[in-house]
C-alpha cells in the first residue's frame, strides 16, 4: 500500500506519520488495528522545506499554498491522507491553503487515480453551540471564522473526490498549541469554574486520533464521500479537565463557580489573546457523537484524553514556560 501524507510536519500529521511508520515496521506486533497482512506499506510525505523524517519515508517538497508545487505528488499512490491546514486568522492564507490548496490536491489525487482519500477537518465548521451529542446528520455547518469557513470549503473538494472526511474535536497531547495553552491563559484571566465547570467537550488525544486516521486510511474501503466525527466517544467534563491539568501542575487549582456574566466581566477586565468566543467553546457544551468511526475501523478508542495527559505533561510544561 502506497500512502501519500500531507501536513507531515504538523501537529496531527507528524503523529500520523509516526503511526504509519510503526504500522509498516517489520516485526511490528499484530493487533486489532493491525491484522496480519502481506502488504508492504510505503509512505511519501510532502513538506514545504527539507526536514528530517523517519527512515524509509520518501520526502517531496510541496506546499498547498503554492498549487503549482503539487504536480505529481500523488503519482503511484493508493491512499492520500490530507492532514494539512492553516488555522490562523489570516483569511487570505486560510483560503489559499484550506480551500484552493485542497482543491488542487484533490485534483492531483483524481489525476493519479488514488483509490482512497482521508481528509482531516474540524468540528469548528458547526460554529457556535451549545452542541450536545449530535451526529453529523443532526447539525448543519455554520462556520464563524475564516479558518472554519475555508476548511468547510475544503471538505467540499474532498467529498467530490470521494473522500472520507474526519471532523476532529479538540485535540490534546504533544504539539497542542491551542487547547491547553488557551486553558492556561483563561485560568489566569478568569480564575474560577466557568459555568461551574459543567460543560462537556469532545476531546481526543493526538496519539489516539493518529491511530484512528491510520486505521481509516488502511482498513476502510473507499468512502464514496462520507463525513464522520473523529472524537473520543466519551465527552470530558470541563471541571475534570481543569482538575487533571492542575494535578499535573499545568494550571493553578480553580474553585468557585462563575456565572457567564462573571466570566465575561473578568475576561474584559484582564485582556489577553483568547477571545470570548473561544471561552464559550471551552466552557459550554460542545460534544459530538463519536462511536461510529471507531466501530467501523475496529479501533479501540483508548483510555481517553484525560488518561493520556500525564504522558504529555513534560512537553506542556516546556510549552507553557513552567520549567
Where are the predicted features?
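Mid/C-terminal beta-alpha module of Rossmann-like enzyme folds, strongest
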Residues: 212-276, 317, 321-323
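Conserved Rossmann-fold NAD(P)-dependent oxidoreductase catalytic core, especially the SDR/UDP-sugar
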Residues: 103-146
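Conserved beta-loop-beta element that borders a ligand/cofactor-binding pocket
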Residues: 155-175
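N-terminal Rossmann NAD(P)H-binding glycine-rich loop of SDR-like oxidoreductase domains
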Residues: 1-25
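Amphipathic terminal alpha-helices
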Residues: 290-295, 300-323
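Substrate-positioning beta->alpha
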Residues: 177-181, 195-218, 225-229
Amino acid at each position: 500500500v502506497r500512502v501519500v501524507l500531507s501536513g507531515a510536519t504538523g501537529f496531527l500529521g507528524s503523529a500520523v506519520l509516526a503511526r504509519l511508520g510503526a504500522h509498516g515496521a517489520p516485526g511490528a506486533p499484530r493487533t486489532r488495528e493491525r491484522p496480519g497482512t502481506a502488504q508492504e506499506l510505503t509512505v511519501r510525505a510532502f513538506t514545504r522545506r527539507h526536514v528530517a523524517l523517519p527512515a524509509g519515508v520518501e520526502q517531496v517538497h510541496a506546499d498547498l499554498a503554492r498549487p503549482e508545487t503539487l504536480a505529481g505528488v500523488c503519482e503511484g499512490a493508493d491512499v492520500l491522507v490530507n492532514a494539512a491546514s492553516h488555522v490562523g486568522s489570516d483569511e487570505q492564507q486560510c483560503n489559499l491553503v484550506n480551500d484552493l490548496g485542497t482543491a488542487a490536491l484533490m485534483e492531483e489525487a483524481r489525476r493519479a487515480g488514488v483509490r482512497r482519500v482521508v481528509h482531516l477537518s474540524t468540528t469548528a465548521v458547526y460554529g457556535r453551540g451549545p452542541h450536545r451529542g449530535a451526529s453529523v446528520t443532526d447539525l448543519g455547518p455554520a462556520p464563524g471564522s475564516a479558518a472554519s469557513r475555508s476548511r468547510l470549503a475544503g471538505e467540499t473538494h474532498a467529498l467530490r473526490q470521494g473522500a472520507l472526511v474526519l471532523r476532529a474535536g479538540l485535540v490534546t497531547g504533544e504539539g497542542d498549541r491551542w487547547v491547553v495553552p488557551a486553558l492556561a491563559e483563561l485560568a489566569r484571566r478568569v480564575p474560577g469554574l466557568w459555568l461551574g465547570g459543567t460543560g462537556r467537550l469532545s476531546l481526543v488525544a493526538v496519539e489516539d486520533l493518529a491511530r484512528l486516521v491510520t486505521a481509516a486510511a488502511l482498513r476502510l474501503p473507499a468512502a464514496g464521500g462520507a463525513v464522520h466525527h473523529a472524537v473520543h466517544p466519551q465527552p470530558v467534563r470541563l471541571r475534570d479537565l481543569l482538575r487533571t491539568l492542575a494535578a499535573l501542575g499545568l494550571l493553578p487549582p480553580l474553585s468557585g463557580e462563575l456565572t457567564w456574566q462573571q466570566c465575561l466581566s473578568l475576561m474584559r477586565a484582564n485582556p489577553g489573546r483568547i477571545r470570548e468566543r473561544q471561552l464559550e467553546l471551552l466552557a459550554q457544551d460542545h460534544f459530538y457523537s463519536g462511536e461510529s468511526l471507531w466501530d467501523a475501523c475496529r479501533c479501540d478508542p483508548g483510555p481517553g484524553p484525560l488518561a493520556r495527559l500525564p504522558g504529555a505533561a513534560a512537553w506542556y510544561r516546556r510549552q507553557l514556560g513552567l520549567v
